C-alpha cells in the first residue's frame, strides 16, 4: 500500500513482483489476485512475473509451484488474456 511505497527506494513494479512472490510463498490466495493486478498496473511483463515466481518456487519447493500457476493465471486474467 501507500505506506510501503512512501520513501521506498524500490519502484512500484519491483515491489509488486516481490509482493506477488511473497503471496505465493505464504499461500495467500487473495493476496495473489491483488498483487497480480498491481503488477499489471505497474507494467510488469509476464517474463518478469515468471522470474519472480521462480524465486518463490526455488525457496518454497512444490507448494510454490502450484501457487505460482495460480499467480500466473491471475496475472493473465488481469491483463485480459
Predicted regions and their residues:
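Iron-sulfur (Fe-S) cluster-binding segments and ferredoxin-like electron-carrier domains
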Residues: 33-47, 72-75
Amino acid at each position: 500500500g501507500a505506506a510501503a511505497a512512501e520513501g521506498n527506494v524500490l519502484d512500484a513494479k519491483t515491489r509488486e513482483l516481490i509482493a506477488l512472490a511473497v503471496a505465493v510463498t505464504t499461500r495467500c490466495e487473495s493476496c495473489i489476485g491483488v498483487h497480480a493486478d498491481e503488477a499489471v498496473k505497474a507494467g510488469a511483463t509476464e517474463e518478469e512475473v515468471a522470474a519472480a515466481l521462480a524465486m518463490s518456487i526455488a525457496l518454497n519447493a512444490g507448494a510454490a509451484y502450484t501457487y505460482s500457476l495460480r499467480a500466473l493465471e491471475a496475472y493473465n486474467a488481469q491483463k485480459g488474456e
